Amino acid sequence: MFSRSILLRSVRKSLGRYYSSQAHPQTYIYNLLSDTKCRSCGIQLQDKFPDKPGYYRLPGQNDSNTDNKAKTSELNKKYEKILQNLDISDRNLLINNFSAPKQDDEKVTSVPSLQQITPVEADTRDTTKDQQTHSGHSLSCKRCNDVIYNSKTRSIYDPNRDNLNKSEFPIPKLQQVLSTIPVDAPLVYVFSANDFPMGINKDIFQYRPPQQIYFVMTKSDILIPKTNVAFYNNFKKFLQNYMFKKFNVPRENVFIASGKDRWKMTDLYHFIPNYSYIIGDTNCGKSTLVKSLLINHHVKHWKYEARQQRPDEKQSSSASLKNKDFKKLDRLIDSFSSKNGPGTSHIPGFTRDVLPVDIDGIKELFDVPGFTTNENLQDIFDKLNHKQIARITKGANTSKYGSLKSKFDTVKNGQVLSLNGVGYLQFPGQDSMYQIRNVTKFALHKFKNLEKVDSILQRNEIPKSMSSHFIVNRQQQQQQRNELRGYYKRYIIPPFYGTIDLVIKDIGYINIKPTGKKLTNELMVLYLHPSLEAIIRQPILNYIDPPTPKKSPDGTNRKTITSDISKTPFYSRLIPSTVLSDPSSLVLSPPSSDYNQLNQYLQIDESSESAYNDLLELDETNKYDYWIE
């Protein structure tokens, strides 16, 4: 039975590649090269040039260019001496049983390298393919192995480490990515629920009509509880209406799923067309989504086999699994995930080339490198290690941290809210008060004002009691102080009435709710590291758990909030502001200066009634007049 299933799988895969080649010759080329690509990032593998991309080493292969050089114990030396006296057939048999003695902190050096196994003039791709067949699963390049196993506590872009610097994590532009995709191939655009709608690049519609693109929101587990069907249906309806009214995307072309929790994977399998290319912003969750589809298919087979191994029990697809079956299933998933691509990582630019992924011998997808519009995206990661990146990009659960019942903090009277030291949100003064709900993994801290922030950053060391509030290490505080004065970008938060979300790309959002009587028109200001981007939007919770519509004075029901999508802005860009005039001080600029910059940016005449100033009254009727999408 097993042999028959393998045969059918091979036939289906061959037929699939044949029909794919008829429609898309470029797709056929990707398939031909798939056996010699890194299973994690998709780059073409090679074993001859350690200083070039795609280099990989066999387990135990010595490499003079690495800091961790392979060591040979006395026991291994004796083993090698005995090995040399054996016949070739016996030697190969002994090597292949993987029984070479080794210590925990040592690498086996008795396994010959590729250069020793094959002639020097042999083609690198053939060598790679032979090794894949021999090992039983695909290979990963050295860069990917370094990221997975050696980057837990060090900067991921350390220039002193081989094959682990910015050049190894290229992030292309949208146009570059699309140039690698056949013009008539299906496109699936993946965007994250973590920073919606920032993950949707409107430039995509310059290359494809909206009717020909499928949109998938992933990471939805941080927005919607899996068990709450009503919340899911509410938000799905809103998202479909939003995509249709804003971009003319057919409602049936919009889907919501979670790659991390493998939520809605069976439905997603049927939603995505065959031979689709999976595109989206870097770090949006494309590879995780594709891998979850692959794992979901294998899980079905593993569950089926587990039930078949219990002949005395009723055989049905709904038969429950035992605890030992689930434990075995978890081990199988972990083992399968570690040996099969695509690779997943929190590091931007991890996927480097188009990577074909065969799901079940019938459906094949192509994982594509993520793109970005932010040229400074990688700068912040110079200061972070792998664990820090994983923490801040994980996202926080809305139902736990962003609901009306969630814990909140209070900011008032011109205080400054530090976003783990990579951003500073300056609140208005004059008896203002705000409730803050932190739906990010940032550690927030309140300072009295910007002068207090500056005084702390002037110190040689950050006090230990406050070190957790700054994500960068102590040696970088002086640099950060200088950056805050000039390098950090200054943004004016557009005027708002009621509650808003301040959304930070790839990170999450902070819910801001004014309380008490409004006494000032002074604007909020955000100082943000240039590697990060932010917007404000209407509270996302209103579209997950919509408030009950109030009745009009005539007794009729008012329209729901989702009916106003096309009439009011859902989000607004922040207003770029000029840098402080005095670089030696962080003295606050007068509110009138921010008013002028806001009016100029929105092209509003200072003398008109709609000009923003201290005399303007902001209410329900004009609260979106100063928002710009």
From Swiss-Prot:
A single cellular component GO annotation: mitochondrion
Superkingdom of origin: Eukaryota
Entries under PANTHER family matching the protein: GENETIC INTERACTOR OF PROHIBITINS 3, MITOCHONDRIAL
UniProt transit peptide range: 1-19
Subcellular location: Mitochondrion
Family to which the UniProt record says this protein belongs: Belongs to the TRAFAC class YlqF/YawG GTPase family. GEP3 subfamily.
Organism listed in the record: Candida albicans (strain WO-1) (Yeast)
Protein name from the UniProt record: Genetic interactor of prohibitins 3, mitochondrial
Major subcellular location class: mitochondrion
Entry-linked InterPro entries: G_CP_dom, Mito_lipid_metab_GTPase, P-loop_NTPase
Function: May be involved in the mitochondrial lipid metabolism.
Composition bias type Basic and acidic residues, residue spans: 122-132
PROSITE patterns: G_CP
Chain residue ranges for the region called Disordered: 104-138
All residue ranges annotated as the CP-type G domain in the record: 171-374
Segments crossing the lipid bilayer: none
GO molecular function annotation: GTP binding
Keywords: Mitochondrion, Transit peptide
